[in-house]
A protein has these predicted regions:
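Conserved, single-site charged/polar hotspot
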Residues: 1-304
């Protein structure tokens, strides 16, 4: 069916978790208060990362800034960058808490060389300093709900509203992921994309209340909407399907899975003078911005 491979026993909640949660670091974390992040001798701890098929150690700061640089545009406003930094840090620490200490991190990030290559020499210095400042100025800050670290998904552009976590995951464990209106997203030039995929006899058979696809019929089989999006590299989880000359025409709205923070709206809010905390509290209901304490990470001063 157009190259589509169905996972017979696929579970929606587990699939989303695999997509949205970063893999763990070689690290132990204890959350026991609201004081500042403790660092050994004032230097950044090291984490083990798989890069170019090899494992190596880099500083936690280098890794966090590298993810931040890869995940959001360098020309974003300061408060939007800070909000993104908090989401990345929260995901890191939640993975640490949930998954343990023995896994090598594989989440992609940009090195300094990749930043310069992607941004160009004219912007590299300015953008790097903005990323570093956003990371440093939110040092230790994470999002918590009811005293626990939360799942912190984000996406580039919504279809005009974000989706409910409880609805997307089919679970009541995500009360802080409520659907939020993002009216300016629909005005973005990247809001709509049209593509063609091989095969026909495909039909959207389920959507959530925000309009994102939850289920697709492919011939005699039914597949999860997010798996369908990723298999066919669609821009968004909000899409329609139409038979077209033996193929399937896909019209997608937005960019990404639609959960959590819309980066586009976050940048607009920052431009309007909203703070990092105001942005985060808009997209994540009833959460608090806290600070982690007592971090113990495997050290290697040489990063080897």
């Amino acid at each position: 069916m157009g190259g589509f491979i169905m996972r017979k026993y696929f579970r929606q909640a587990g699939y989303f978790a695999a997509i949205l949660i970063l893999l763990p670091y070689v690290v132990t974390i204890l959350l026991n208060g609201r004081s500042s992040l403790a660092q050994d001798n004032g230097t950044s701890p090291y984490v083990t990362v798989k890069s170019d098929e090899k494992n190596r150690k880099i500083s936690l700061d280098e890794y966090g800034i590298g993810i931040l640089a890869k995940e959001i545009e360098g020309d974003a406003e300061e408060e939007a960058l800070k909000a993104q930094a908090v989401l990345i840090r929260t995901s890191i620490y939640k993975s640490i808490q949930d998954e343990g200490t023995s896994t090598v991190l594989t989440k992609e990030y940009w090195t300094r060389q990749q930043m310069e290559s992607n941004w160009g020499a004219d912007h590299y210095g300015e953008y790097y300093e903005k990323m570093k400042a956003a990371w440093d100025e939110t040092r230790g800050q994470v999002l918590m709900y009811d005293g626990k670290l939360i799942l912190t998904p984000y996406h580039r552009l919504s279809n005009g509203k974000t989706r409910s976590g409880n609805e997307a995951f089919g679970s009541e464990e995500y009360p802080y992921l409520q659907s939020r209106e993002c009216p300016e997203d629909v005005e973005a030039k990247e809001e709509m994309t049209v593509s063609m995929i091989q095969g026909s006899d495909m039909e959207v058979t389920g959507t959530d209340n925000a309009g994102y696809v939850t289920e697709v019929r492919c011939g005699s089989e039914t597949v999860n909407g997010e798996e369908f999006r990723r298999t066919y590299h669609l821009a968004s989880s909000c899409f329609t399907l139409q038979d077209y000359d033996g193929k399937t025409r896909v019209t997608a709205k937005g960019i990404g899975h639609g959960l959590g923070m819309s980066q586009y709206t976050a940048k607009k809010m920052a431009e309007e003078g909203k703070s990092c905390e105001e942005i985060l509290q808009y997209f994540f209901t009833d959460v608090s911005l806290e600070e982690v304490t007592d971090i113990v990470i495997e050290k290697n001063e040489k990063g080897e």
